[in-house]
Amino acid sequence: MSARPEGSPPEVTLETSMGPFTVEMYYKHSPRTCRNFLELSRRGYYDNVLFHRIVKDFIVQGGDPTGTGRGGESIYGSKFEDEINKELKHTGAGILSMANAGPNTNGSQFFITLAPQPSLDGKHTIFGRVCRGMEVIKRLGSVQTDNTDRPIHEVKILRTKVID
């Protein structure tokens, strides 16, 4: 592992069944959300968890250990509040955000955008971006899904590795 410059944001590599990708955390903008994602990653919470929802040209969603899209908890208990920052927008592919069921309902689920999604701005906490492995995100985004946006063939996070 190469040394990272001091003061650079933490990163997490997600090794998936379709290859690895790495996300850079926006710790200054979303500290509680980043802390949640980093700690869950360190604990192995996301290991062997499915990407349960993939919508072409929209998002790749995962982080629910039940694989249903209805589960998952944060390190703070059940749910925690949004950290919406007006400077951060879903301007393109590779934006890492929290999935939620409405305001202040963040748990463990997250999504990565596959294209600009301005309709999500102000509704989902953006807490990072894909900094390496965008080709893996593109492959994930093109898998065949059923009529509920669930992949026909399982795609999952095999393990996560925090790079401090």
From Swiss-Prot:
Q: Does the keyword Cytoplasm apply?
A: yes
Location (main, coarse): cytoplasm
Alphabetical GO biological process terms: protein folding
Please give the tissue specificity annotation from the record for this chain: Ubiquitous.
Gene Ontology molecular function: any one: peptidyl-prolyl cis-trans isomerase activity
Q: What class of enzyme is it?
A: isomerase
Question: Where are the bilayer-spanning segments?
Answer: none
Q: Please provide, in alphabetical order, the Gene Ontology terms of the cellular component aspect for this entry.
A: cytosol; endoplasmic reticulum
InterPro entries annotated for this entry? Cyclophilin-like_dom_sf, Cyclophilin-type_PPIase, Cyclophilin-type_PPIase_CS, Cyclophilin-type_PPIase_dom, Cyclophilin_A-like
Q: Which UniProt keywords apply?
A: Chaperone, Cytoplasm, Isomerase, Rotamase
The chain positions of domain PPIase cyclophilin-type read 12-162
What switches on expression, per the entry, is described as:
Down-regulated by pathogen.
Q: Which family does it belong to?
A: Belongs to the cyclophilin-type PPIase family.
What is the designated name of this protein? Peptidyl-prolyl cis-trans isomerase CYP18-2
**What gene, per UniProt, encodes this protein?**
CYP18-2
